[in-house]
Amino acid sequence: MDMTFFRAALLGACVLLSGCDSATTPASPASTATVLDGKTMGTFWRVSVIGVDEAKAEALRAKVQAQLDADDRLLSTWKNDSALMRFNHAADTRPWPVSEAMVDIVTLSLRIGAKTHGAMDITVGPLVNLWGFGPDKQPVTTPDAQAIAAAKARTGLQHLQVINQSGRQFLQKDIPDLFVDLSTVGEGYAADHLARLMEQEGISRYLVSVGGALVSRGMNGEGKPWRVAIQKPTDRENAVQAIVDINGHGISTSGSYRNYYELDGKRISHVIDPQTGQPITHKLVSVTVIAPTALEADGWDTGLMVLGPEKAQQVVREQGLAVYMIVKEGEGFKTWMSPQFRTFLVGEKN
């Protein structure tokens, strides 16, 4: 039995910086991009900014890391004392007070969950843990039907409610052991939060990323739009499938081809279908979404990834989303994009 676990450095994130931030070859010294980076939420963050001197850059680095650490304390399922895990551990089914940020994230997640027919399910945590992609250890044997059914009984968006009352925000669950997992949208939220920090700091030209979620504004060091490359679904790093301009938007990619392990001779994807309780097995290997915010993009790409190519395309058409898909076909891949996504393609602009 092969229990080798394969995990990419970016935990399956397959959106790359395209090298257009001029960090190494600026147009002129005054327009050089300052690049800051670090680690958060089990992945990496990167901030590229224009017009920031060395002293401000170091202060900015500290603010970025502090903010991301706070986001992690809000959303982490790996920290038992995070705000989210305190809600998960509580057996009380009465309304539980939470922050406005938490309510915003959960509200959007529930909305996308409904529009993807339950495919984007932030209560899928028990199944994620059962299959070894959460804080629990990886299984040594394939979970049986009884274990899957028991985990599924603790899931379901219908068990979670958002309450806004007299200026206060609450989450309420109707089963004590409901487990909410916001890792599917955490990177998107954190990227948007970094973008707001840049605005607060008076920085109007930036590209920020947390894992596979990115947000940009303004022009890069060469006076051109920030560009992002979508990676080909191969083990070769920096192999580019397409390049897009995302100025003023968020982008996120969900992929099934890097975060997996092998168990009982089968490849186990980290993407779990809430309906079956099992990892996906369809041919869709990558979904990229461009949306007004990275949080929205991060939520949609997860739901569409679960649905598979045919059902996902139907939802994309219904919702008018900007989406790019890569589908396994024989020994190669085929691509599909919505008309809304095509408007962001660099090749379509030139």
Curated annotation (Swiss-Prot):
<comment type="similarity">
    <text>Belongs to the ApbE family.</text>
</comment>
<feature type="binding site">
    <location>
        <position position="301"/>
    </location>
    <ligand>
        <name>Mg(2+)</name>
    </ligand>
</feature>
<feature type="binding site">
    <location>
        <position position="181"/>
    </location>
    <ligand>
        <name>FAD</name>
    </ligand>
</feature>
<feature type="binding site">
    <location>
        <position position="41"/>
    </location>
    <ligand>
        <name>FAD</name>
    </ligand>
</feature>
<keyword id="KW-0274">FAD</keyword>
<dbReference type="InterPro" id="IPR003374">
    <property type="entry name" value="ApbE-like_sf"/>
</dbReference>
<feature type="binding site">
    <location>
        <position position="78"/>
    </location>
    <ligand>
        <name>FAD</name>
    </ligand>
</feature>
<dbReference type="GO" id="GO:0016740">
    <property type="term" value="F:transferase activity"/>
</dbReference>
<feature type="binding site">
    <location>
        <position position="184"/>
    </location>
    <ligand>
        <name>Mg(2+)</name>
    </ligand>
</feature>
<dbReference type="Pfam" id="PF02424">
    <property type="entry name" value="ApbE"/>
</dbReference>
<keyword id="KW-0808">Transferase</keyword>
<keyword id="KW-0997">Cell inner membrane</keyword>
<feature type="lipid moiety-binding region" description="N-palmitoyl cysteine">
    <location>
        <position position="20"/>
    </location>
</feature>
<feature type="binding site">
    <location>
        <position position="302"/>
    </location>
    <ligand>
        <name>Mg(2+)</name>
    </ligand>
</feature>
<dbReference type="GO" id="GO:0046872">
    <property type="term" value="F:metal ion binding"/>
</dbReference>
<protein>
    <recommendedName>
        <fullName>FAD:protein FMN transferase</fullName>
        <ecNumber>2.7.1.180</ecNumber>
    </recommendedName>
</protein>
<keyword id="KW-0564">Palmitate</keyword>
<feature type="signal peptide">
    <location>
        <begin position="1"/>
        <end position="19"/>
    </location>
</feature>
<keyword id="KW-0460">Magnesium</keyword>
<comment type="function">
    <text>Flavin transferase that catalyzes the transfer of the FMN moiety of FAD and its covalent binding to the hydroxyl group of a threonine residue in a target flavoprotein such as NqrB and NqrC, two subunits of the NQR complex.</text>
</comment>
<dbReference type="GO" id="GO:0005886">
    <property type="term" value="C:plasma membrane"/>
</dbReference>
<feature type="binding site">
    <location>
        <position position="272"/>
    </location>
    <ligand>
        <name>FAD</name>
    </ligand>
</feature>
<feature type="binding site">
    <location>
        <begin position="119"/>
        <end position="121"/>
    </location>
    <ligand>
        <name>FAD</name>
    </ligand>
</feature>
<keyword id="KW-0449">Lipoprotein</keyword>
<keyword id="KW-0732">Signal</keyword>
<keyword id="KW-0285">Flavoprotein</keyword>
<feature type="binding site">
    <location>
        <position position="187"/>
    </location>
    <ligand>
        <name>FAD</name>
    </ligand>
</feature>
<dbReference type="GO" id="GO:0017013">
    <property type="term" value="P:protein flavinylation"/>
</dbReference>
<dbReference type="InterPro" id="IPR024932">
    <property type="entry name" value="ApbE"/>
</dbReference>
<feature type="lipid moiety-binding region" description="S-diacylglycerol cysteine">
    <location>
        <position position="20"/>
    </location>
</feature>
<feature type="binding site">
    <location>
        <position position="298"/>
    </location>
    <ligand>
        <name>Mg(2+)</name>
    </ligand>
</feature>
<keyword id="KW-0479">Metal-binding</keyword>
<keyword id="KW-0472">Membrane</keyword>
<keyword id="KW-1003">Cell membrane</keyword>
